Amino acid sequence: MVNLNQSLGDLFKGIIPNVYVLGATIVSFLILFLFITYFVYRPLKKYIKKRKDFLQNHIDLTIKSNVEAEKLEKKSQQKLLETKEFCIELKEKSQIEANEFLEDAKKTAIDNARQLINEGQKVLLEYENEIKSKYYMNVINVAVEICQKYLEKQDKNNKILQQSLIADLEKELKKRENSSKKKDNFGK
């Protein structure tokens, strides 16, 4: 039995560690664990949290910026549509006003021509016996030329007025398009 106890003791003698070595190993493990925890794990955990918060803030800001950009784009599209409608309406009104002005000018020219013709006829009636054959055609020709010149002048003035109105309208459209483009570029 002593042999058996001794052989078992020899067997377990190599398996059971030395208490001092085991204590030193546990203490060194605890020191290493505390060192890694305080000097590596916690700073690394704080850095990862800061980095995660930083990225999340940027993601949130990007989403918010995209939403605001979409809102601004919708507003600018709405304003562009309103501007186009306004320009179409303004163009139609200017064309109507120009046509009315042209008609009024024609009526005035015709009235003036009629008045000139009537005056010419009165003069012709007074001097009918003396200059009937000689000046009858001259008075009518003068009246027609005056009417033509007056109509040409009125037509030219109307064209100039219409061109200036259209040019002003185009400038206004370009200004509004440029301002909307600038807003679009700024929003992007």
Curated annotation (Swiss-Prot):
CDD domains: ATP-synt_Fo_b. It is found in: Cell membrane. Disulfide bonds: none annotated. One of its GO terms (cellular component) is plasma membrane. Keywords: ATP synthesis, Cell membrane, CF(0), Hydrogen ion transport, Ion transport, Membrane, Transmembrane, Transmembrane helix, Transport. The chain crosses the membrane at residues 19-39. The keyword Repressor does not apply. It is a single-pass membrane protein. Its main location: membrane. One of its GO terms (molecular function) is proton-transporting ATPase activity, rotational mechanism. F(1)F(0) ATP synthase produces ATP from ADP in the presence of a proton or sodium gradient. F-type ATPases consist of two structural domains, F(1) containing the extramembraneous catalytic core and F(0) containing the membrane proton channel, linked together by a central stalk and a peripheral stalk. During catalysis, ATP synthesis in the catalytic domain of F(1) is coupled via a rotary mechanism of the central stalk subunits to proton translocation. Component of the F(0) channel, it forms part of the peripheral stalk, linking F(1) to F(0). HAMAP family: ATP_synth_b_bprime (MF_01398). F-type ATPases have 2 components, F(1) - the catalytic core - and F(0) - the membrane proton channel. F(1) has five subunits: alpha(3), beta(3), gamma(1), delta(1), epsilon(1). F(0) has three main subunits: a(1), b(2) and c(10-14). The alpha and beta chains form an alternating ring which encloses part of the gamma chain. F(1) is attached to F(0) by a central stalk formed by the gamma and epsilon chains, while a peripheral stalk is formed by the delta and b chains. Belongs to the ATPase B chain family. This is ATP synthase subunit b. It comes from Mesomycoplasma hyopneumoniae (strain J / ATCC 25934 / NCTC 10110) (Mycoplasma hyopneumoniae). The gene is atpF.
